[in-house]
Amino acid sequence: MDVVEALGFNDPSKTGGSMLTYTLWTTPPNLGEPLNIIISNESDPRVLEETMLDGGLYNYLEAAAFGNQCFGLHMGDKQQANLGDGLTNQTQHTILRYQYFRNHFLGTCLESIYGGNHIRVWKQYSSGAYFLSSSAEEDSTDNHKLGLNAYDAGRDLFVGNATNIRVQGHLEANQTFVGEVSKRGWKYRTTVRYIEDLVPANRTNNHHTSVQAIGGYVSDGLVAVLTVQAQKDQPGLWSEEVSSALGL
């Protein structure tokens, strides 16, 4: 068993896939963005279910402050990914945006105005793991273009939100973080390990090379692998349900 299998996913490049998304209408063609976050199949089975109910994946992602786009309106092109699971290119399952103040009514609307983080989600059906592409974008006055270090910043902002730990500075391969977040009566304990040698650090086949600093790289080449455990939090309190209904 190699290190990737031990971490709970299959390396797409071993079976004809890629750790870069496929983005339409790029110049030159066929450029993509790094799949820089993986939710391991070693996670709690309920977290691997694509549902908001019963502690599922989308409840976890909202616990990390990521939700549906403002009023359900889609902004930006959809992307595809080939995860080497025999399905060739599959379209992203969803795109979720950062919820300012963790408010699930207006939080993503503020992200659309002021910029911030967003994630695209795919499932690798051969392993059951989820692959995410995360990047940080500028505000609406800059047409939401990606800024310097957008891929690494987006990845680390997501990890920070999922663990309640501030992730900053230069990261190393095998560096780990462990932390907890809660949502709708479920507590999630996330163990994060950064691994190398999955995505290219240079500009080869990377879209949005404007994120690359002069003399630097498009990305540090690290992927954050998350193993998420879930358990019932305090019994659902009436006050919690009211707060949730108010988007708090």
Where are these regions (language model features)?
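Cleavable C-terminal sorting propeptides in eukaryotic secreted/cell-surface proteins
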Residues: 219-248
